[in-house]
């Protein structure tokens, strides 16, 4: 079982669209492979990678191109690709100067496309200069195609003008406005909106245009007009951005860009480029969503190994594995006692110099976070946005999964994920620790061959 991650050899990508068909992933990504990793947009079309395992793939060059007039500098913004009755349907937006076009395309095989520029009438309260970043969804109840786009209301440049519109069509050609889907007066811009349903619930996914750049979602029951915020509005942290959803064998998957750092530094800001990371979406009884690894653990082993750490006055830690390698999966159950201050698991740890990376849990703050430990001298790892709210209750057992693949790690706990990148490799140890309290770890399984 591997981290569900895709990155073409010798390049970074952004503006990705993804779907699943006939037991294969179809990944459409920006084709301008010569640009620097920190550059965004500017591509003239999309490459296609077809893969069964996200590791071995076949590339088709420039299968989707801009429909703007030849000779003008164009920027393509990602939309999505939907499978409907054995056909591929795609949408994306093209910017040429200040003009924006929404493009739709239809294909029998996902490689050869018929492309058309669509005409949309924006409501009078919206600015006619917008990035769109559309997404498609087929509503079975009404037999209508729904197209969701990002727009901006008219107003001062500094105002929170970002909004989301939705159009509908019965023939995939003529589009009429269905509703102003959301206008939260919260963001300057809203990017990559996506609309989808699970059972009686409707969901709105979007990326925020701000310093943390996370992927958020809102929910409502069918028939309702307003959106409600779930207990946790993000299913991953800062290291998953500009993504969407696709359907795989009856369930939904969340995907997005796992970015690299600018300036090749762990103090650098996050780039717009990287690789594609995928999570499996699970719906809770109250309509909230959670995420799990795409692949389940092949063998459900219990009681393989267990340990207890306790130090009321300070720190206690134990090296569980000394030679983990750079690709592995560890699953375990964790339980902590009341008044425990902090605990966690360290990866790429070097005990001799007390250096490594860690997923740590802070019960008093009800959060899990990724960090470099020790993060000094003041400081060496920028981890803003790399934390999640987690319900941490003393005496309760929590299943935890940590996946490591070279410079990438992903934590799954309590229905959320925290993805991260690690530029360095201080050591090769896997270590558990607790600070001012007691931690019991059980059913530990370490699979060094999980990622091939």
Regions found by a protein language model. Give the residues of each.
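Beta-rich carbohydrate-recognition and catalytic domains
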Residues: 1-133, 137-188, 197-237, 258-310, ...
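Repeated scaffold domains used in trafficking and secretory/extracellular systems
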Residues: 189-193, 239-243
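Short tryptophan-centered beta-strand motifs in secreted/extracellular beta-sheet-rich domains
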Residues: 195, 330-332, 396-411
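Beta-strand-rich interaction surfaces with strong enrichment in secreted/lumenal proteins
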Residues: 231-232, 316-323, 345, 386-392, ...
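Secretory/extracellular carbohydrate-interaction modules
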Residues: 311-375
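Short, aromatic/His-centered strand-loop micro-motif at the edge of beta-sheets
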Residues: 376-399
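Short, solvent-exposed beta-strand-to-loop segments that form ligand-recognition rims
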Residues: 415-435
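Extracellular beta-strand elements of beta-rich domains used
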Residues: 442-449
